[in-house]
Amino acid sequence: MEGRHDNSPTQAFDKDVLELTVEDVYDISYVIGRDLLKVNTGGNREISDLQFKIVRVLEMFETMVNKYNLSLEELRMEMDNMRTETDRVVAEGSSGNINTVGPNKLVVDLKDPNRPRFTMQELKEVLQERNKLKAQLLVAQEELQLYKSGVLSSQQNMVEVNLETVPQSEPLRSSITEESKEKSTIQKLFSFRPK
């Protein structure tokens, strides 16, 4: 504050616009007000109107300088935060806490709820398996509809076919074992799958 008393209010006019503070705006308004009082000794109406316009401009100027200083302070705080974060990352890197990552590698934050959980290959395999299961479900549903409509007999035995061997002309009923008679309904429905 002592340096402030040593400086005259007119020095605020010599500063760069971006260096002005709110106190400088007050100094400028003081100088302009003092000069207007010297001129307005005669009570001239035009000078009085000009005085109100100047006060309004100074108020706008004060608001603008205040906003600029707040923005500047926010930027300084952000810069300090970034500098602190950079120092922390550098310190972690030098202490060996960070694994080195080569090209074509992705660093994933395990706490991020939107992180990728599967590789593309795993997703392709899951989708292919899903499509196969969908196809099997559709076949099973069609077969179930045939059973319900009576087209297929519910007592009709299903035969498993091995696609790698040459099929016999007609399977013998005596070759059906007791084990195949006890198959569950789901096993019967999916018995068309190749071995």
Curated annotation (Swiss-Prot):
One of its GO terms (molecular function) is dynein light intermediate chain binding. Residues 8-92 form the RH1 domain. It is found in: Cytoplasm, Cytosol; Cytoplasm, Cytoskeleton, Microtubule organizing center, Centrosome; Cell projection, Cilium. The keyword Coiled coil applies. Keywords: Cell projection, Cilium, Coiled coil, Cytoplasm, Cytoskeleton, Protein transport, Transport. It comes from the Eukaryota. GO terms for cellular component: centrosome; ciliary basal body; cilium; cytoplasm; cytosol; membrane. Residues 58-149 form a coiled coil. Its main location: cytoplasm. Residues 115-185 form the RH2 domain. InterPro entries: DZIP_RILPL (IPR051241), RH1 (IPR034743), RH2 (IPR034744), RILP_dimer (IPR021563). GO terms for biological process: cilium assembly; epithelial cell morphogenesis; protein transport from ciliary membrane to plasma membrane. PANTHER family: RILP-LIKE PROTEIN 2 (PTHR21502:SF2), ZINC FINGER PROTEIN DZIP1 (PTHR21502). Belongs to the RILPL family. Involved in cell shape and neuronal morphogenesis, positively regulating the establishment and maintenance of dendritic spines. Plays a role in cellular protein transport. This is RILP-like protein 2. The lineage of its organism: Eukaryota, Metazoa, Chordata, Craniata, Vertebrata.
